[in-house]
Amino acid sequence: MIPLTHGLILAAILFVLGLTGLVIRRNLLFMLISLEIMINAAALAFVVAGSYWGQADGQIMYILAISLAAAEASIGLALLLQLHRRRQNLNIDSVSELRG
């Protein structure tokens, strides 16, 4: 079993990497992937904390986070597919130019 601090540090590093990718990248697909990394980092923190205290609540929260991430990814990919069909571009700047 890894110590609590090591697991939380790993989760924080993953969260910061996802946040950095979300802020820096202009492609919507990479932004969606960065958001998934952030969700998984938060879920990892739940699992590590639950394992440290010997509770199954962390694993239950992980299952909830994974199901929410799957729903978010499916809706996000459907929107990205429609945007790519209409604009032939996944740049975030093209979304801000939408009319109507």
Curated annotation (Swiss-Prot):
GO terms for cellular component: NADH dehydrogenase complex; plasma membrane. The chain crosses the membrane at residues 4-24, 28-48, 60-80. This is NADH-quinone oxidoreductase subunit K. HAMAP family: NDH1_NuoK. NDH-1 is composed of 13 different subunits. Subunits NuoA, H, J, K, L, M, N constitute the membrane sector of the complex. PANTHER family: NADH-UBIQUINONE OXIDOREDUCTASE CHAIN 4L, NADH-UBIQUINONE OXIDOREDUCTASE SUBUNIT ND4L. Pfam families: Oxidored_q2. The lineage of its organism: Bacteria, Pseudomonadati, Pseudomonadota, Gammaproteobacteria, Enterobacterales. Coiled coil: none annotated. InterPro entries: NADH_UbQ_OxRdtase_chain4L/K, NUOK/Mnh_C1-like. GO terms for molecular function: NADH:ubiquinone reductase (non-electrogenic) activity; quinone binding. Belongs to the complex I subunit 4L family. It catalyses: a quinone + NADH + 5 H(+)(in) = a quinol + NAD(+) + 4 H(+)(out). Keywords: Cell inner membrane, Cell membrane, Membrane, NAD, Quinone, Translocase, Transmembrane, Transmembrane helix, Transport, Ubiquinone. It comes from Klebsiella pneumoniae subsp. pneumoniae (strain ATCC 700721 / MGH 78578). It is found in: Cell inner membrane. NDH-1 shuttles electrons from NADH, via FMN and iron-sulfur (Fe-S) centers, to quinones in the respiratory chain. The immediate electron acceptor for the enzyme in this species is believed to be ubiquinone. Couples the redox reaction to proton translocation (for every two electrons transferred, four hydrogen ions are translocated across the cytoplasmic membrane), and thus conserves the redox energy in a proton gradient. Its EC number is 7.1.1.-. It is a multi-pass membrane protein.
